[in-house]
């Protein structure tokens, strides 16, 4: 009788022990799973994975070594047209201006220029390496997540290219497109369309041309220093000869040719096409096909005293290949496709926009 009681107690102890071990193991697995979940955001900043809506089995992997594309230039220089044409390509996504990226880059530049601030940061352990790593993660997060996934991601924030050299350092495989336009046309567009740009006095052609000269000189110099990583594209030539320049551009970016880039207006608002912002000033222009309407609208609008001093006010005009005294200038003859687009727009009853 006593032997049987001992046997029953032993069985009961074994059952209780087994249940306890099972519970502890399960609890440990749950804790491990939660820790993994909590660590995921930290990992995602270094290695982001998104999935397309079309094929959930195909992930897009993003990291600092991917071939990012940055489009920039002085505002009103064709940056929106360029990004819309690239956005029409099925393998590329640019999207709207983030507005955040040039501001955070300007802040980083300010820290670097101030010897006192840099010393304070170094003393706090916030070294250049720490800041570069943080900038990589922050910028990549913005670029990746503010739009749809794609094989090639691009960012279009015009003044971001003031930091072209730094961007090339933290994104070693990135490429840059610098949009160049006749400064007289860019400035007339800013003033006539009342496009507010920090530091530009829209009541003065002289002031705006001086600021244009300073900004484009900064970006153009960095573009040349970046050598085969940066391609300057003249807005006038892109508009006059879109196929030639888009083929040149896609070869530069190592992206296969696609005819869709010549007809961006047909893909506006469509899935996988061109997404436009309601608040960007160029939106009402890029909904049209490529045309020459805006090329010479500045002629006859610039004050005579500014025209007289143009070569001194804006020496970058001559450096970029524009004649500062030509009024009107001769940019060249448009391709037949562009001529046809322009004629159709001129026959349209829609009121033309100033540019």
From Swiss-Prot:
Region span, Disordered: 325-355
Biased composition (Basic and acidic residues): 341-355
Subcellular localization, as worded in the UniProt entry: Golgi apparatus membrane
Active site feature: 97
Its membrane topology: Single-pass type II membrane protein
This protein's UniProt keywords: Disulfide bond, Glycoprotein, Golgi apparatus, Membrane, Signal-anchor, Transferase, Transmembrane, Transmembrane helix
Record-listed E.C. numbers: 2.8.2.20
Listed SUPFAM superfamilies: P-loop containing nucleoside triphosphate hydrolases (SSF52540)
Disulfide-bonded cysteines: 94-154, 223-230
Positions in the Lumenal compartment: 26-355
Superkingdom classification of source: Eukaryota
EC class (word): transferase
Transmembrane segments: 9-25
Function description: Catalyzes the O-sulfation of tyrosine residues within acidic motifs of polypeptides, using 3'-phosphoadenylyl sulfate (PAPS) as cosubstrate.
PANTHER family according to UniProt: PROTEIN-TYROSINE SULFOTRANSFERASE 1, PROTEIN-TYROSINE SULFOTRANSFERASE 2
Family, per entry: Belongs to the protein sulfotransferase family.
Protein name, entry field: Protein-tyrosine sulfotransferase 1
Species the sequence originates in: Danio rerio
Gene name in the database record: tpst1
């Amino acid at each position: 009788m006593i032997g049987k009681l001992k046997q029953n107690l032993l069985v009961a102890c074994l059952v209780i022990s087994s249940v306890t071990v099972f519970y502890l193991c399960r609890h440990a697995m749950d804790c491990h799973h939660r820790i993994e979940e909590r660590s995921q955001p930290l990992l995602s900043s270094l290695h982001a994975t998104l999935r397309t809506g079309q094929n959930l089995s195909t992930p897009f992997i993003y990291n600092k070594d991917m071939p990012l594309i940055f489009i920039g230039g002085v505002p009103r220089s064709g940056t929106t047209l360029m990004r819309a044409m690239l956005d029409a390509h099925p393998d590329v996504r640019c999207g709207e201006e983030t507005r955040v990226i040039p501001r955070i880059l300007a802040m980083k530049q300010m820290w670097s220029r101030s010897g006192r601030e840099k010393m304070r940061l170094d003393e706090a352990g916030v070294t250049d390496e720490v800041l570069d790593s943080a900038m990589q993660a922050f910028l990549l997060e913005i670029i990746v997540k503010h739009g749809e996934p794609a094989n090639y991601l691009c960012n279009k924030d015009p003044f971001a290219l003031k930091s072209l050299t730094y961007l090339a350092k933290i994104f070693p495989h990135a490429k840059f497109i610098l949009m160049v336009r006749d400064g007289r046309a860019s400035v007339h567009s800013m003033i006539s369309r009342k496009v507010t740009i920090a530091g530009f006095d829209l009541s003065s052609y002289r002031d705006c041309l001086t600021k244009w000269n300073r900004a484009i000189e900064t970006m153009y110099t960095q573009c040349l220093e970046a050598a085969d990583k940066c391609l300057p594209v003249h807005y006038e030539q892109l508009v006059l000869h879109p196929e030639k320049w888009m083929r040149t551009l896609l070869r530069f970016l190592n992206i296969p040719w696609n005819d869709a880039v010549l007809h961006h207006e047909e893909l506006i608002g469509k899935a996988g096409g061109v997404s436009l912002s309601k608040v960007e000033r160029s939106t009402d222009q890029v909904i049209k096909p490529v045309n020459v309407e805006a090329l010479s609208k500045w002629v006859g609008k610039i004050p005579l005293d500014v025209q007289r001093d143009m070569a001194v006010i804006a020496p970058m005009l001559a450096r970029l290949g524009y004649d500062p005294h030509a009024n009107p200038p001769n940019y060249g003859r448009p391709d037949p496709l562009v001529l046809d687009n322009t004629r159709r727009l001129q026959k349209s009853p829609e009121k033309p926009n100033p540019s």
